[in-house]
Amino acid sequence: VYELGLVEAISIPQKECFAGALDFARMEGIVPAPEPTHAIAAAVREALACKISGEEKVILTALCGHGHLDLASYEKYLNGEMIDADLSDDVISKAMESVPVIALDNQPLLKRPLKKTAC
């Protein structure tokens, strides 16, 4: 889906993700697992952008799992112990060199670079 240009890949700091997850939990009664908190934060960003611009959009996000098995991450966030890692593009590129390329029909699955977004 990313390769087809149908979705964007962005980087969102952990604290923003967990803030969105707590708002979601308060409103929906579901504690999200840490993984979907990124999608929730992106949906919140999109909704706020629409609020500012006056644009009306349907915003869809996915929620997988629940956070009951990873409450330690929520505890770190609530106690102010969570940090946002701000890795440089060079550090990320170096780390990506050790990740094996998985190909489908001899074509790498990821051709376009992921983009970092500023907060």
Regions found by a protein language model. Name each.
Residues 1-30, 76-119:
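Active-site/ligand-binding loops adjacent to catalytic centers
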Residues 12-14, 34-36, 62-64:
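Fold-independent oxyanion-binding glycine-rich loops
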Residues 42-104:
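Catalytic phosphate/nucleotide-handling subdomain of diverse soluble enzymes
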